[in-house]
Amino acid sequence: MCNVSQDSCNIDSRLDSLFPPTLYIFVMVIGFPTNCLSLWAAFVQVRQKNELGVYLLNLSISDLLYIATLPPWVNYFLHQDNWIHGPESCKLFGFILYTNIYISIGFLSCISVDRYLAVAHPLKFAKVRRVKTAAVVSAVVWAIEIGANSAPLFHNELFEDRFNHTFCFEKYPMEDWVAQMNLYRVFVGFLFPWVLMLFCYQGILRAVKTNVSTEREEKAKIKRLALSLIAILLFCFAPYHLILLSRSVVYLGQPCDCTFEENIFTAYHVSLALTSLNCVADPILYCLANEGARSEVTRGLAPLMKFFSASRPNMDSFARSVTLDTPWSSRRAAAPSPRSWSLCGQTGGRGRRSRVRRRRDCKC
């Protein structure tokens, strides 16, 4: 163990006082309303007995909790990494901030597995894909991530640097238990879910490719959505966990060497800020690009649409903008083709006739 003092690393916290707070403000402005819409749309799907809505609901709650912690962190970075709200609030907001990263990843994994079962094995796992099962799985995800990331609640997380700034959830060099916890976060909290998601979406692509009844346009839509998810997951979370792993490995090898910490400090904070973009990507990829959820959002915004656009009789163009069509969602159709597959997650009807139809159409 390194016995150097807590301010032995000459960290200049003034270097990153612009980018993180700017990005956090952007995420709050965009992420809060879109996740509120996602929350409402997911709730509607849950009421329709759609198990995908359960995961979307929990994902939106996780993102909103994350966004709720951003204002004090904006203040923290604007004051050059100086926490002024006391030790208990540091523990609380830091715990929520870091834990929700992995809760979000956990529910993205749940959605990936659910979509894989729906597309690749629509009949074999039909009984597993139920609202009650999704609720139990969601409770397990919350319990595991909260328990696995609760250690900082029992340690002092305020540390002063050479500028008399009070760091929150940051110590340079880090402590032994933090380095070990970081390894768990990297391999269990990030790498394992990412490999699982990659496996699921490769299975989805194989199932779509081998099914001759799937239309070409629908195949392209599913592939774009799948590949875009992997890309955004890598963009939002991979840089942070790569740097986190590097910091932990270097510390465990040379606990008293601050050179690496000093050189990578700004990059570490930038990568941490990039994880917040997941709160903007989630509702676009998994809710607003969803046929059922998109129609619910459009219908829910209809009163506001009429109120703010009373002088504009033609509402068609506005309705198209509300759907937030992205490169991952093709233009909206009047009704899904009976020969096409979808990642919509809509629950079919009960009974023998619906099962025969599902077997013939191979739909979600």
UniProtKB/Swiss-Prot annotation:
Residues 1-8, 81-85, 157-172, 251-260 are extracellular. The keyword Glycoprotein applies. Residues 46-49, 122-129, 211-214, 290-364 are cytoplasmic. The record marks E145 as: Required for activation. One of its GO terms (cellular component) is plasma membrane. Keywords: Cell membrane, Disulfide bond, G-protein coupled receptor, Glycoprotein, Membrane, Receptor, Transducer, Transmembrane, Transmembrane helix. Belongs to the G-protein coupled receptor 1 family. This is G-protein coupled receptor 4. It comes from Callorhinchus milii (Ghost shark).
